[in-house]
Amino acid sequence: MEFDNQRPIYLQLLEEFKLKISTGQWQAGEKIDSVRSLASFYEVNPNTIQKALSELEREGLTETRRTSGRFVTDNTSLISDLEDDSFKKIADEFIEGAKNLNLEKDKAIDDLRNYWEKNYD
């Protein structure tokens, strides 16, 4: 993962971890790798991983079980809300970009549909 020097690394990791949850890479109820393992994988200080994971827990997306480790929440409603938020963020970026290009809504949607069908179907 390439980090943006303009933003705190723990926030970038927080976004990465939320994406893993919202896309199902980290499933509801699944045990998350240890802080040390994640720090090694992302090549960052364990304290940075801990800070991102603590924020996930504060938001209710993970829970720590005293002797078992850290797990993704079983609350599927919360995960669904996270999926919605992730989609809205991407949609906002697309709409902002289309507006910056002075595209009409219908043209932007048609262009996206055509591009999707040509490149991703």
Question: Which residues are covered by each model-predicted region?
Answer:
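Extreme N-terminal segment that seeds HTH/winged-HTH DNA-binding domains in transcriptional regulators
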Residues: M1-K31, S37, D81, D85-D121
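Short, mixed-charge, low-aromatic patches
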Residues: Q6-Q12, N45-S54, R65-V72
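Short Asp/Glu-rich motifs
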Residues: S40, N75-T76, E117-K118
